[in-house]
Amino acid sequence: MNRAFCLLARSRRFPRVPSAGAVLSGEAATLPRCAPNVVRMASQNSFRIEYDTFGELKVPTDKYYGAQTVRSTMNFKIGGATERMPIPVIKAFGILKRAAAEVNQEYGLDPKIASAIMKAADEVAEGKLNDHFPLVVWQTGSGTQTNMNVNEVISNRAIEMLGGELGSKKPVHPNDHVNKSQSSNDTFPTAMHIAAALEVHQVLLPGLQKLHDALSAKSKEFAQVIKIGRTHTQDAVPLTLGQEFSGYVQQVQYAMERIKAAMPRIYELAAGGTAVGTGLNTRIGFAEKVAAKVAALTGLPFVTAPNKFEALAAHDALVELSGAMNTTACSLMKIANDIRFLGSGPRSGLGELILPENEPGSSIMPGKVNPTQCEAMTMVAAQVMGNHVAVTVGGSNGHFELNVFKPMMIKNVLHSARLLGDASVSFTENCVVGIQANTERINKLMNESLMLVTALNPHIGYDKAAKIAKTAHKNGSTLKETAIELGYLTAEQFDEWVKPKDMLGPK
């Protein structure tokens, strides 16, 4: 039979039938009109025929997506598999489509169809159908192709559940049923917000909390370790190592607070705005009901956006969230840099901290160990800063009633949230919890510091104190020796007035 089909195809100059892999990579072609039995034979091999408004397309028989998804793979061969739409967006779409089906059933959608849509949407939300979403981020700026990818997958999976034929659009139509009362223009931004909120709550905030708690524990552990401070990378007056770490604790605390402060706008959903924000082709109450369903499904306080025109045309909420993550990246860059510099050495650096040794550090220098967790964290911070630039550009390009940088924006927001959350956990578990204070080195550096002379200001004045420091530095002598030689004070006075433990706060 296969040979007969090949001969028939050759005699009628039919195009070569691509494999499923070729279709996925974009090598799909339209099939000329031919006898039904020929189409059936083709379907029994590696593909089936589906239609969109532009015509017929070959769809791999083992995939639930349809013609519009295949056409997108043909038109947007950009980046390959590594640039696919983030899975959190796909899962968020599953949540949204289930919620919409529930509400549509309340408004009269056939319960049998609604139930099948809900079951298929649940599979999408649970990640069971991830292999059926091949589209890349770099597509239409509204995310229309991905919305249709979701509609097609849910439609065909629902059809299969109901015993129908894949690609027939019966009894479950991707547009008329799965996308009922919806537009890509309001569903994609809704999925963006759902995905961002879930990533923040499941990955980012838990990671930052773990880091915060570990730094807080170290701050308490190092509360009695007095060390020399540094400003402008030069010696300054003393503080405790615990005080130094308390600054890091507060930075991470503020980071979490900034992120949480941005979330109320993320919880506002565009669903119900349809094409331009007017809500055309929806029912009164649809938007509110969908938001309530999404809130129930996720356990997060989602509400309908008070102004759908803003929700479709601007994504300031995502720019705001990205900005909070950008600030977090700045904080983590500073913390990681401080820790790796304080741990520099082991013999030729500052050496005040002893960092965990996790792996060999050099392919040529035996015994070398590097602050790799600090380096990973700083690279993550740099990437997040770059992501924020892209999100900012995207957010500023909402034209009239629609922002058309949606896929790029959510890709970068999710990337930042995931990186910061994961890096915080890695940095905590593989570095922070194992940090030790090198008290011998800390005491040596503090006792040699010329800035202890600052304690003499109230007793002998700034000018004399400065002369003591400069003379001691020039002669290589100690502050005490120099102060006595200059006749500014006695040994007893120096010992009474220059006590690092008395220089740690106001009197």
UniProtKB/Swiss-Prot annotation:
Pfam family, one: FumaraseC_C
InterPro entries tied to this protein: Fum_hydII (IPR005677), Fumarase/histidase_N (IPR024083), Fumarase_C_C (IPR018951), Fumarate_lyase_CS (IPR020557), Fumarate_lyase_fam (IPR000362), Fumarate_lyase_N (IPR022761), L-Aspartase-like (IPR008948)
CDD domains tied to this protein: Fumarase_classII
Modified-residue entries (N6-succinyllysine), positions: 58, 63, 77, 112, 119, 220, 289, 464, 470
GO cellular component: chromosome; cytosol; mitochondrial matrix; mitochondrion; nucleus
Keywords, ordered alphabetically: Acetylation, Chromosome, Cytoplasm, DNA damage, DNA repair, Lyase, Mitochondrion, Nucleus, Phosphoprotein, Transit peptide, Tricarboxylic acid cycle
Modified positions (N6-acetyllysine) in chain numbering: 58, 63, 77, 91, 112, 119, 210, 220, 289, 499
Transit sequence range: 1-41
UniProt key word Mitochondrion: yes
Active site: 232 (proton donor/acceptor), 362
EC numbers for this chain: 4.2.1.2
Modified residues (Phosphothreonine): 82, 233
Pathway: Carbohydrate metabolism; tricarboxylic acid cycle; (S)-malate from fumarate: step 1/1
A biological process term (GO) from this entry: DNA damage response
Function of the protein: Catalyzes the reversible stereospecific interconversion of fumarate to L-malate. Experiments in other species have demonstrated that specific isoforms of this protein act in defined pathways and favor one direction over the other.
Family the entry assigns: Belongs to the class-II fumarase/aspartase family. Fumarase subfamily.
Subunit structure and binding partners: Homotetramer. Interacts with H2AZ1.
Entry protein name: Fumarate hydratase, mitochondrial
Organism expressing this protein natively: Rattus norvegicus (Rat)
Lineage of origin: Eukaryota, Metazoa, Chordata, Craniata, Vertebrata
